């Protein structure tokens, strides 16, 4: 599919309006993008979510095309690419600033970006994991809605999202789109703290048996459900938020 436009190397498959840019907190570089980088790129970074993804993907007989929905700054996209080096990895997000950071870090290797991050990390008593950034993953980044991806039917083996479910506005069409792009036997992996911010979401998805039933009714079966605690470290003194993360691995039937 041909993109609507390309901005600094990032193809757009969704025509994001000026007002949408202004209203999107994930387009705020200082308050959101840098904090997202702090979560994943310091020596104190989270790792259990990555471990869960890798373990689930390894269980699938074929993992040659992998999609991350809501890839942010590309940490999981890059690490999955490193782990499964022969696979084609797509990272989609609706934030241009997040995608731009991901491209600068993993594809363009911009030293100025590393310098900005180093200064930000040092301000909080942390250090940037420069060695990790030496990776050169094989991944493609694009701005797109996860409910309408620029991919052909049944071309994907693994589709996953991290810390996204409680932010999706249209969960039904999100799951239906994952069902469309996944081959039969492909995996849909969803994980996150499920920290819902309104009464309706809590009533809809919690307890999690409701979420599982919802996804299964749309053409999947649950093959794994796990939970773990993950620290989001703020500074060099290890001040942090402890997230209670839930992970689900579904197979398309």
What are these regions (language model features)?
Residues 1-24:
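N-terminal auxiliary segments of SAM/dcSAM-dependent transferases
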Residues 42-62, 75, 79:
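Conserved alpha-helix/loop element of class I SAM-dependent methyltransferases that forms part
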Residues 63-72, 90:
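Conserved class I S-adenosyl-L-methionine
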Residues 95:
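Conserved SAM/SAH-binding beta-strand->alpha-helix loop
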Residues 107-144:
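S-adenosyl-L-methionine
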Residues 144-159:
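A short acidic, Gly/Pro-enriched loop at the edge of an enzyme's catalytic core
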Residues 172-184:
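A short glycine-rich, Lys/Arg-flanked "PGG" loop and its adjoining helix->strand segment in the class I
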Residues 185-193:
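Conserved beta-strand signature within the Rossmann-like core of class I S-adenosyl-L-methionine
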């Amino acid at each position: 599919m041909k993109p609507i436009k390309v901005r600094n190397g990032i193809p757009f498959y969704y025509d994001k309006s000026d007002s949408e840019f202004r209203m999107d907190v994930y387009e705020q570089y200082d308050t959101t993008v840098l904090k997202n980088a702090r979560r994943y790129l310091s020596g104190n970074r989270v790792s259990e979510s990555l471990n869960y993804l890798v373990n689930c993907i390894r269980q699938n007989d074929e993992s040659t095309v992998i999609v991350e929905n809501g890839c942010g700054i590309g940490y999981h996209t890059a690490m999955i690419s490193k782990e499964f080096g022969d696979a084609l990895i797509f990272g989609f997000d609706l934030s241009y600033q997040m995608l731009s950071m991901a491209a600068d870090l993993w594809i363009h290797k911009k030293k100025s970006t590393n310098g900005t991050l180093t200064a930000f990390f040092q301000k909080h008593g942390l250090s940037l994991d420069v060695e990790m950034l030496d990776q050169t993953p094989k991944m493609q980044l694009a701005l797109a809605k996860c409910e309408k991806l620029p991919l052909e039917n049944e071309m994907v083996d693994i589709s996953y999202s991290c810390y996204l479910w409680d932010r999706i506005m249209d969960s039904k069409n999100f799951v239906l789109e994952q069902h469309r792009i996944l081959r039969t036997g492909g995996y849909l992996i969803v994980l996150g703290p499920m920290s819902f911010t309104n009464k309706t979401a809590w009533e809809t998805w919690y307890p999690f048996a409701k979420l599982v039933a919802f996804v299964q009714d749309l053409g999947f079966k649950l093959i794994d459900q796990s939970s773990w605690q993950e620290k989001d470290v703020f500074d060099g003194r290890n001040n942090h938020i402890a997230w209670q993360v839930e992970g689900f691995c579904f197979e398309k039937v």
